[in-house]
């Protein structure tokens, strides 16, 4: 009797295995987890490559206060679990570079230009949304960089090709204007404690950039006049 019972259970388990193997919900979450792991690994690889390429005379360091502030803003996003980290480059040129997985690189020039807490929150929050919406990963895939960088990840550290990694990083940096900056602006504002106040602060800051920077050096973060227009049109929830 026990033998038949055990046999029946084995048959039942075997019959369930194909169903579980193709379970779309399980497959979705497994794929999502794998993609997140790949995203974090790619971000770490790009960050290390960026740091290795940086000239010694320009200092770059992690900013604990800004990192904590970014993580606090990320609590209101769909990807609060990522380890958001802010690196600051000692450069007068305002710039910001979101990397996959949670790293944000900003210049001291950008932080100096952001004269209020609301403006700094805007910078951090919009980059939280870039990362939360996987804009950096979409850019990597759209530019055809994904297979190459995955291949480098699978290679042992000491055997990775620095020339290939350098090209990946440069191609990514060159195409940052293609990120959806308008969407990051509009959704990032909603992460802050006072979206309306942040919106006004953002408009003021971007207008100052459009006068000082945009006419002579189009900024990497998209079409400034168009971004300002979208922020001015934005209707916030009551």
Language model features by range: what are they?
Residues 1-4:
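Positively charged n-region of N-terminal signal peptides that target proteins for export
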Residues 6-15:
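Bacterial N-terminal signal peptides
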Residues 8, 29-30, 171:
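A general structural-boundary detector
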Residues 16-21:
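Sec/Tat signal peptide C-region and signal peptidase I cleavage site
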Residues 22-145, 193-197, 203, 209-225, ...:
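Peri-catalytic and regulatory segments of divalent metal-dependent proteins
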Residues 36-40, 155-205:
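Metalloprotease/metallohydrolase-associated module, dominated by Zn2+-dependent proteases
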Residues 137-163:
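Post-HEXXH active-site segment of zinc metalloproteases
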């Amino acid at each position: 009797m026990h033998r038949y019972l055990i046999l029946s259970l084995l048959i039942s388990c075997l019959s369930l295995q194909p169903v579980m193997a193709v379970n779309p919900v399980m497959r979705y979450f497994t794929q999502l987890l794998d993609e997140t792991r790949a995203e974090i690994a790619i971000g770490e690889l790009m960050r290390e490559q960026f740091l290795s390429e940086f000239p010694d005379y320009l200092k770059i360091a992690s900013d604990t206060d800004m990192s904590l502030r970014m993580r606090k803003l990320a609590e209101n996003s769909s990807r609060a679990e990522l380890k958001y980290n802010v690196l600051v480059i000692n450069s007068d040129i305002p710039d910001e570079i979101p990397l996959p997985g949670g790293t944000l690189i900003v210049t001291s020039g950008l932080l100096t230009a952001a004269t209020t807490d609301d403006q700094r929150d805007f910078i951090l929050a919009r980059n939280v949304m870039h990362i939360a919406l996987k804009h950096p990963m979409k850019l990597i895939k759209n530019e055809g960089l994904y297979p190459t960088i995955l291949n480098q990840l699978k290679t042992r550290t000491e055997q990775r090709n620095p020339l290939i990694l350098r090209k990946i990083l440069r191609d990514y940096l060159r195409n940052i204007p293609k990120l959806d900056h308008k969407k990051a602006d509009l959704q990032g504002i909603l992460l802050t404690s006072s979206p309306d106040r942040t919106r006004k602060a953002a408009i003021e800051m971007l207008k100052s950039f459009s006068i000082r920077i945009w006419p002579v050096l189009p900024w990497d973060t998209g079409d400034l006049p168009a971004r300002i227009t979208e922020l001015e049109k934005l209707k916030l929830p009551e």
